[in-house]
Amino acid sequence: MVEMEQAEAQLSELDLLASMFPSENELIVNDQLALAELKDCIEKRTMEGRSSQVYFTINVSLDLSEAAVVTFSLSCILPFKYPTVLPEITVRSVSLSRSQQTQLNTDLIAYLQKNCLGDVCILNATEWVKEHAFDYVNIEALPSPARQSTAQPEDLAFTRLWIYSHHIYNKCKRRNILEWAKELSLTGFSMPGKPGVVCVEGPQSACEEFWSRLRKLNWKRILIRHREDIPLDGTAGGMEGQRKFPILEEKAFSVHGARGNHMDFGQLYQFLNARGCGDVFQMFFGVEGQ
């Protein structure tokens, strides 16, 4: 299978997945720039200029018992030669221990190697997880709904951090932002390019841990441009009610510039304004959005 056929197969599969998982939280394209590159290369009939692998997440909620609904997240990275080679898929769930998660992923890879090599297989992988997830979860160890609804005592404040960076290009840094936010149950968005913008929101302790990790990476310049701290009553409902973003995803707004690294700030402002954050635009850039 030649490069163009591989790229077209990837895009066709993404279109299929979008129709199978229409909800905003079911299919999340974590790397919008990579998807834009893929579409552009197919349109121009050349693979020149393609630098990033498509990266997305599928969230599947399963009723494993009358009292337990467990969410499994499939983080999927499509190598340039996929589907000739297998995708990189990692399944995660807060309901799995480390050993359970490792075993599930090992068994999934073995299934894909045996049955799907050479064909698109993300949907097959998702169906396999739906069918076999029960085998890896200890139902009795799952927290009760009452315990799930209560926040930890230290998370009595909701925090939203608006982080400014001179630029965000590095693929490892961009992946860290997405994976750390998911690990820490933070929502928001990340806008790569020059300048780079990251917004994370959630429990105060989680936001501070995210910032502690992020600032330790090698940056030309990075700082918290604006911070919001909101006291809560200690319930998860109060925490969730403060969120302005359903997930944390990477956003690309009409990429332009010689290196394709500048975003359309008008679209960024519209995105922020639609979520009640339009006033932050002036704090960031010193001009009113429009």
UniProtKB/Swiss-Prot annotation:
CDD domains: RWD_RWDD2, RWDD2_C
SMART domains per UniProt: RWD (SM00591)
Gene assigned in the entry: Rwdd2b
Family matches, as Pfam families: Prp3_C (PF06544), RWD (PF05773)
Name of the protein described by the UniProt record: RWD domain-containing protein 2B
Domain annotation RWD: ranges: 12-136
